[in-house]
Amino acid sequence: MYNKHHKTLKLHIKKGDTVQVLSGNYRKKQGTVLKVFPKTYRAIVEGVHIVSKHKKPTAKNPQGTIEKVEAPIHISNLMLIESATSRPTRIGRKLDEEGKLQRYSKKTGEFIKNG
């Protein structure tokens, strides 16, 4: 899964992107990326992959609780939603007019604004 000697790849998903889940129990569900974990190739998506987390009793909460939280999902199961068309698109990278490497939509060819 994670090898500390292996170089991590650039990911097509960034924090703040709107994505759609491609496979699994949450297939076709959309959400915003809350956090990305590049070393393990996973991301937390808002409203997707909800799990129950058991909290121990504390002085503040002597009963203890069961909370519903989002768990990470593998990046290969996510596809970026293009803001212009609201449809999933594949991502590529190419140089823009300023010579900077930018993400672009392979469907429309337009550059994707970061963040």
UniProtKB/Swiss-Prot annotation:
GO biological process: translation
SUPFAM superfamilies according to UniProt: Translation proteins SH3-like domain (SSF50104)
CDD domains cross-referenced by the UniProt entry: KOW_RPL26 (cd06089)
Source organism, top-level taxon: Bacteria
GO cellular component: ribonucleoprotein complex; ribosome
Gene Ontology molecular function: rRNA binding; structural constituent of ribosome
Keyword Oxidoreductase assigned: no
Matches recorded under Pfam families: KOW (PF00467), ribosomal_L24 (PF17136)
Segments forming a coiled coil: none
Keyword vocabulary terms for this entry: Ribonucleoprotein, Ribosomal protein, RNA-binding, rRNA-binding
Family: Belongs to the universal ribosomal protein uL24 family.
Function: One of two assembly initiator proteins, it binds directly to the 5'-end of the 23S rRNA, where it nucleates assembly of the 50S subunit. One of the proteins that surrounds the polypeptide exit tunnel on the outside of the subunit.
Subunit structure comment from the entry: Part of the 50S ribosomal subunit.
Identification of the protein by name: Large ribosomal subunit protein uL24
Species this chain originates from: Amoebophilus asiaticus (strain 5a2)
